[in-house]
Amino acid sequence: RNGEAPKHLPSEIAAVITYLPNQDGYFHRRLDVIKACLRSMRDGANVPVMVWDNGSCPALRDWLRDDYRPDILILSHNVGKQSARRAMVGMFSPETIIGVTDDDMLFYPGWWSESVKLLKGFPNVGLVSAWPTRMAFDWATSSTTAWAADNAEIETGHYITQQEETDYATSVGVPVGEHLQRVASRYDIRIRYNGMTAYATAQHCQFIAYAGRIMPYCWYTPYAMGGERSFDEAIDKDG
């Protein structure tokens, strides 16, 4: 690999793993999506930015190097998402707050500071995600809800809006009507603790965490994609 890095590693950093092999077919609008992701991520977080690029085409690499210019840029062959995450997290000291995201997320202003409030405000936090979806309550939530049953207030209901679920379905290519029907019988879980309210879910697609907390569960793997729920479940089992 090759890249650019600062002389001193920061105590907080937002990181994204990019992948754009070409601009044909499925990928024909992907460059614009990645640009929107990275710009909104940086605009909403007053912290340094790191990009790990997994063997993308020149169009993206040129933009990253010449226009976007992240604080840390690593240009790698395609090692896969999980291996890239393992390598990134391993660069930083255990107390570093690191955010890791897919390259197709859209961030709202203030997303970083609000996420850090939850990370520091709740005890024994594994991950904090800035985007909830009702389907994600189906896995990796048992430790969170077990803790909340004795230490906080739990609420169940439909708090995630239909528009937010519609946006989620559109972003992952699931028919909207089919998705809304699937989640209609499910419920969101919210936890109130020490003046804060959070959904009882977080997942691999986008999160912030302490590097040392998640390092044992970041694995090198020969697979480019897939199997990532095991990361969420391992974090949850850790308590």
Which residue ranges define each predicted feature?
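C-terminal catalytic/acceptor-binding lobe
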Residues: 1-10, 30, 179-239
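N-proximal low-complexity "stem/linker" segments adjacent to membrane-targeting elements
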Residues: 1-40
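Conserved donor nucleotide-binding strand/loop of the catalytic core
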Residues: 64-79
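Conserved catalytic core of nucleotide-sugar-dependent glycosyltransferases
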Residues: 112-213
